[in-house]
Amino acid sequence: MNEKIVLPGGAGLVGQNLVARLKDLGYSNIVVLDKHRANVEVLRKTQPDVVVECVDVSVPGEWLSHFDGAAVVVMLQAQIGGTDWQEFVRNNVDSTRVILDAIKTKNVPYLVHISSSVVESVADDFYTRSKKEQEEMVLASGIPCPILRPTLMFGWFDRKHLGWLSRFMQRVPVFPIPGNGRYMRQPLYVGDFCRIIISCIENRRGAGVYNISGHEKVDYIDIIREIKQATSSKTPIVRIPYGLFYALLWTWSLFDKNPPFTTQQLAALSAKDEFEVIDWPGTFGVSSTPFKKAIDETFNDPRYSSVVLEF
């Protein structure tokens, strides 16, 4: 378990979960490279024996020496939210170019690329466009690797999705739902996804593109109800017209450069996406955690449920 694993962008949702699970399995030579200082500090506190460097992986520098002797790279870096297109280019596209070059130059033998289900989405937003370009770069690189396309994920350290929704629920007198709330989601438990990544690492799965979606279809409003139950929240859930919800988000964005939820993400929420469900439990030898159990683990785990990352 001493092979060197490098995780660019490893201080985010997937990275923090992956490090925790790798450590539980006995992996001891893990390097995390991430530019989000606050989340880097969270990782240093929760996993003090992991090598963590706060760097911008879109800019070549001395940090590339961490690829020397690496056995595995799991490419995790991603700009998910925001309103500045150039941030998506820098963090999703430019960074990928730098890392792919490093993998080739340093002769790293194995790569796992984390793409996104949005590359097949009908949505057209900054995240979708940049992730499509990123995946195309990986495919064109000539590096044979598994490409994993997860849907919306939740779990420990979730700052952006269900984690933010749960904290928002604790702070407001009522919880607003756009329209009727019947927007079908296929949420993926990040614990399951990390076990898929580990399966790739341990079995050196070769080239292929895999759509990794949650095996349960759950409407947005029912996700909120499950969060309410798991956190014992008393906040009432209130439906408001879609147009008003959109206007409120637009107004919020005028005062917040990096809002937790944008009008583009609202449009993506209401897009009628249904992603392919493959037999990833059979393919990767990983069982699917029932949604209700996964929600309970997310919000009630004694080790990590109270750890919160920054946006």
Regions found by a protein language model. Name each.
Residues 5-25:
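N-terminal Rossmann NAD(P)H-binding glycine-rich loop of SDR-like oxidoreductase domains
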Residues 8, 33, 73-77, 111-117, ...:
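SDR active-site strand-loop-helix element
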Residues 27-37:
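Conserved glycine-rich Rossmann-like NAD(P)H-binding loop of the short-chain dehydrogenase/reductase
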Residues 50-94, 102-104, 117-121:
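NAD(P)H-binding glycine-rich loop region in Rossmannoid oxidoreductase-like domains
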Residues 94-132, 141, 146:
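Conserved Rossmann-fold NAD(P)-dependent oxidoreductase catalytic core, especially the SDR/UDP-sugar
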Residues 136-156, 166:
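Conserved beta-loop-beta element that borders a ligand/cofactor-binding pocket
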Residues 167-188, 196-200, 204, 211-213:
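A conserved pocket-lining segment of Rossmann-fold NAD(P)-dependent short-chain dehydrogenase/reductase
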Residues 200-261, 275-278, 283-311:
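Mid/C-terminal beta-alpha module of Rossmann-like enzyme folds, strongest
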